[in-house]
Amino acid sequence: MGNPASGKASANCDHLKELIREVPDFPKKGILFYDITTLLKDKTGFATLIDALSEHFISDKIDLVLGVEARGFIFGPAVAYRLNAGFVPVRKPGKLPAATQKYDYALEYGTNTLEIHSDAIQKGQRVIIVDDLLATGGTAEATAKLAESLGAEIAGMGFVVELDFLNPRKKLTQYDIFSLLHYDK
């Protein structure tokens, strides 16, 4: 599974890459950071991005879009609006006011936790996960497992940027993955 950007979205990928600033040695030496804030401020680029993410899932009858803190909160609501779906935030621990379901997952050096309201998803609802970046696949996998623990059916995952050289799809083989932009370094 997993689809590269295709059709109309693919035709616009080069334009979107031109709008992303590359920042070397951020957040630490040896890391090349892809700064999307320059894309966000471009109204045509931002609209193209939201349209392309939405169009990939438009025929899937999505009930909810799950946005992962923090940049998933930028794209998720706009995609949800386009899909006539609800939006659910997936947050860091202690940020949601009502009862939550949590999922702990391993990082290279330690662990992290994601939370969602316990009543955010009804059993059988079709959801997509939207975030800015697919790097190692750990956060996406944790978000999917968290949603599935509440009875969600994961219809797919949509990302703005995918770091192909980290091979993130190996953790996510059972999911339909759509990434607009691919980087090999």
Indicate residue ranges for each PLM-predicted region:
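Short Gly/Thr/Asp-enriched flexible loops that form oxyanion-binding sites at enzyme active sites
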Residues: 74-85
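Residue-level signature of catalytic and energy-coupling elements of molecular machines
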Residues: 30, 65, 87, 157
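PRPP-dependent phosphoribosyltransferase catalytic core
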Residues: 2-8, 12, 18, 141-185
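Short glycine-rich phosphate-binding loop at a beta-alpha junction
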Residues: 62-69
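Conserved acidic residues
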Residues: 63, 125, 155
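Conserved G/P- and acidic residue-centered "switch" motifs that form tight phosphate/ATP-binding loops
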Residues: 132, 137
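Short, glycine/charge-rich flexible loops or terminal/linker lids adjacent to PRPP-binding catalytic cores
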Residues: 85-128
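Active-site-facing substrate-recognition patch
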Residues: 2-62
